[in-house]
Amino acid sequence: MATWANLGLQDSSSPLMEQLNFFHDHTLLILTMITILVGYIMGMLSFNKFTNRFLLHGQTIEIIWTVLPAIILMFIAFPSLRLLYLMDEINTPSITLKSIGHQWYWSYEYSDFLNLEFDSYMVPTNELETNGFRLLDVDNRVVLPMNNQIRILVTATDVLHSWTVPSLGVKVDATPGRLNQLNFLINRPGLFFGQCSEICGANHSFMPIVIESIPMNYFIKWITSMTN
């Protein structure tokens, strides 16, 4: 989860988020190199006294500053397109989870099992346990098995919402009358926190998301206890 004064991204908990981290570092390196180059050129032009008295046109330099940015943009565009296609690819998911946004809570349905659905509200501060997370804990967590492909279907009943878990690299818009889907895999056990990322009204800040990732055998026991 995000911590105080954290300057970087959250620790990745899915292969998708690992790829997003790599792309972030790749792009930041290119931007740093451009900044240093432009700063050096500006400094060199500002502090030297040289003047070219025979300069009529700059065809060579114009070709360079047209072609070079195009090449740099290609180095950014190709990894970005690859990631976009990876995010849209859904291969035989093990479990389908449906998330429905409301003002101001989430409801979940496990489509592969009968009668398994519940609402998830934020735990108010005055009811929070000592070891709870303020404005992040919920009364009913989403329980999912680790190391399994999970498909999530997201929609809303009233206004626009956005189902977002940063450490998994997941952000899906919840649009009334429309089903959006995304595929992800959690590669370690733990609790993963997220929040609605689309302004949806007065209590937009108070509809958190909590995912509890557990091994498959414990997940089967949880499913059995919930359906019984």
Curated annotation (Swiss-Prot):
The chain crosses the membrane at residues 27-48, 63-82. One of its GO terms (biological process) is ATP synthesis coupled electron transport. Mg(2+) binds at residue 198. Binds a dinuclear copper A center per subunit. One of its GO terms (cellular component) is mitochondrial inner membrane. Residues 49-62 are mitochondrial matrix. The keyword Transmembrane applies. Its cofactor is Cu cation. InterPro entries: CcO_II, CcO_II-like_C, CcO_II_C, Copper_CuA, Cupredoxin, Cyt_c_oxidase_su2, Cyt_c_oxidase_su2_TM_dom, Cyt_c_oxidase_su2_TM_sf. Belongs to the cytochrome c oxidase subunit 2 family. The gene is COII. Cu cation A2 binds at residues 196, 198, 200, 204. It catalyses: 4 Fe(II)-[cytochrome c] + O2 + 8 H(+)(in) = 4 Fe(III)-[cytochrome c] + 2 H2O + 4 H(+)(out). It is a multi-pass membrane protein. Component of the cytochrome c oxidase, the last enzyme in the mitochondrial electron transport chain which drives oxidative phosphorylation. The respiratory chain contains 3 multisubunit complexes succinate dehydrogenase (complex II, CII), ubiquinol-cytochrome c oxidoreductase (cytochrome b-c1 complex, complex III, CIII) and cytochrome c oxidase (complex IV, CIV), that cooperate to transfer electrons derived from NADH and succinate to molecular oxygen, creating an electrochemical gradient over the inner membrane that drives transmembrane transport and the ATP synthase. One of its GO terms (molecular function) is cytochrome-c oxidase activity. This is Cytochrome c oxidase subunit 2. Residues 1-26, 83-228 are mitochondrial intermembrane. Its main location: mitochondrion. It holds the Pfam family COX2_TM. Component of the cytochrome c oxidase (complex IV, CIV), a multisubunit enzyme composed of a catalytic core of 3 subunits and several supernumerary subunits. The complex exists as a monomer or a dimer and forms supercomplexes (SCs) in the inner mitochondrial membrane with ubiquinol-cytochrome c oxidoreductase (cytochrome b-c1 complex, complex III, CIII). Its EC number is 7.1.1.9. It comes from Anopheles gambiae.
